[in-house]
């Protein structure tokens, strides 16, 4: 095998690993979006209009954060924002069992990619860092509300991971939350409209 061919394969492998890492973050963000919608609607009483507005604002922040040219919204500034307000997002993420985090990233048993633990944790931290300022600034959440929100997120992550006794189904998943909104409230979260 020539050196150029070997280098090409190494580059392809590196590219595939980077794509897998990015996909882990997207998987976590997608699951967390469903969890956020359920918690904010059921536990904090946000309306559908507020939920759609919340989602749009978080996505807007994510795009701004991913823009390398924009130095105003970085991981560091978001972390400092939470630290100044005594919201310990990193500690909260570390408290969640790794098996739960792997499940949220759609990685089954023995399917973890190299370095997945750090990538999953950083994706979960980033998701929360993008979300918390929106809740505090747009919806006037107090620190106690944020801590309750984090508590409910932890509970729902556990419900995603935990299987029902004697069954293969988990207690909760994205489709269950979507169906709940369709059946009870006549709203499709995926389409963002009434049904």
Features from the language model and the residues they span:
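Intrinsic disorder/low-complexity detector
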Residues: 1-40, 64-137, 166-195
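Amphipathic alpha-helical segments that form the core helices of the histone-fold
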Residues: 54-63, 149-160
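Short loop/beta submotifs within extracellular cysteine-rich repeat domains
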Residues: 143-144, 157
